[in-house]
C-alpha cells in the first residue's frame, strides 16, 4: 500500500474518500473539519451517532473530495489505541469494498500524533491483507492512503508501522499456505529467500545433520512422513559484537494428523495452522530486519510433518532429546513439545541468549482455559513476563500468565524416562506442556506463548476489522514492538 502524510487542510484535499473518526455524542469529527465540511460531517454523524463499529457517509458536492466516510469510536472516555486501529481497518475495508482508488484519513488528535499515524497504518494494512495465491481472480491493488496529521514524527512512525505489518503479512501468508504447498523443505526455502539483507542469514539443517546433531525429538516426530524435517535458523546481527542475542523459537508442524494417535477427521484441515508459531518467528525476523533494529536476534524454527505410517514414532517409545534427557511417548499428538524442546536446548547452548521467547499452537487445553482471544503465557522470570505483558497491552495481542511450580513439574515425571510427553489426564494441560519445555532450558529468562487459540480465526474469535479470515499473525506485532522498545 502506498502511504503518504502531511498536515494539509482536509477541506482542500482531493480524494475519493475523506475519512475521519467520531466520538459518541460529538457534534463534529475528531481532527476533521473546515469550511464547507462541517455541515456535511454533521449530516453524516446523524447516521451513526459516533457509536463504535458504525460507518456512515455522505456526498460532498462542490468540494475536492468526492465523499466523507466516518467511523464511530464510541464514548470519549473509552477510546483506546486498538479502537483507533480497528476503526481505521473498518474504514479501509469500506473504501476497498466500494472500489475506490484512494482515501485520506484524518488523525483524530486524541492520542500522541505519531502513534495515531502508526495505528491508522496498522489498521488499514492489516485489514486489507488478502490470501489469494490460489485464486484465479486476485484482490488487486490496495487503495492509496493519505494520513492528515500525525505530527513531525509521522513519516518515521508510518515507515516503522509498515515494516511491522509487512512482517505480519509474511507470517500470515506462510501460515495460510496449504500443507501440500508448504512442507518443511519449502518453509525452509521461504526463510532463505527472506534473508536478503547483509545483517541477516539463514541456515537450514536437514535430516542427516539433525541425526548427527542429536535432535532426537525433531527426528522422531518427522520420521513418519516422506517430507523430511528441517531446523531453520535465522541470525540477525544488528547489535554490537558480543551483545547477547534474544532467541525466538517457533513450532512449525506443517501438517499435524496426530500421527499414530490420530486426530478426528473433523476440522483436521485446520492443522495446516500448526505451523503458526514458526511463521510468527519468521514474520518477526522480517520486521526486525526492515526496522534495522540495533539488536541481535536469533529465530529458530523446528519444522516437521506429523504423519502416521510404518516408520512413525509410537506411543511407548522413549526418545532422547537434544538436551540429553529422555522422553517417554504417551501420545504422538503431543509432538510440538518434542520439537520445541530440541530447538530451545539448541538455542540456549549455541547462542547463550539474554532471553528466550517461544511461540506454539501447543495445546487445545489453552483454548478450553482462555478461549480464542487470549494467548497463554508461562515464564520462569517475573520481570520478563511483565515486560511481555506490557508489550501485549500496546498491541492488543492479549496474553494471560499461568503458574508453573514444582507440583506441575512433577506431573510430567516418568517411571521409565526423565519425563513423559503428557501430563496427568486432562489436568492443567497447557501448564504441563510448558513444564516439558522448561526442562529443556537452564536459567535463561524464558517466556512461552501458547497461541493455539489466537493463531487463526476460529468460531469464538472476536472479529476485528484488521483480522480477516485465516491466520492472524498473532505475536508478530507484540514481539517486534517489544524488541523495538528494547533497542531504544
UniProtKB/Swiss-Prot annotation:
It catalyses: Release of an N-terminal amino acid, Xaa-|-Yaa-, in which Xaa is preferably Leu, but may be other amino acids including Pro although not Arg or Lys, and Yaa may be Pro. Amino acid amides and methyl esters are also readily hydrolyzed, but rates on arylamides are exceedingly low; Release of an N-terminal amino acid, preferentially leucine, but not glutamic or aspartic acids. It is found in: Cytoplasm. PANTHER family: CYTOSOL AMINOPEPTIDASE, LEUCINE AMINOPEPTIDASE-RELATED. Keywords: Aminopeptidase, Cytoplasm, Hydrolase, Manganese, Metal-binding, Protease. One of its GO terms (cellular component) is cytoplasm. The keyword Membrane does not apply. Binds 2 manganese ions per subunit. Presumably involved in the processing and regular turnover of intracellular proteins. Catalyzes the removal of unsubstituted N-terminal amino acids from various peptides. This is Probable cytosol aminopeptidase. Its EC number is 3.4.11.1, 3.4.11.10. It is an enzyme of class 3 (hydrolase). Its cofactor is Mn(2+). The active site is at 263, 337. GO terms for biological process: proteolysis. Belongs to the peptidase M17 family. It comes from Cenarchaeum symbiosum (strain A). It comes from the Archaea. The keyword Lyase does not apply. GO terms for molecular function: manganese ion binding; metalloaminopeptidase activity. Mn(2+) 1 binds at residues 256, 333, 335. Mn(2+) 2 binds at residues 251, 256, 274, 335.
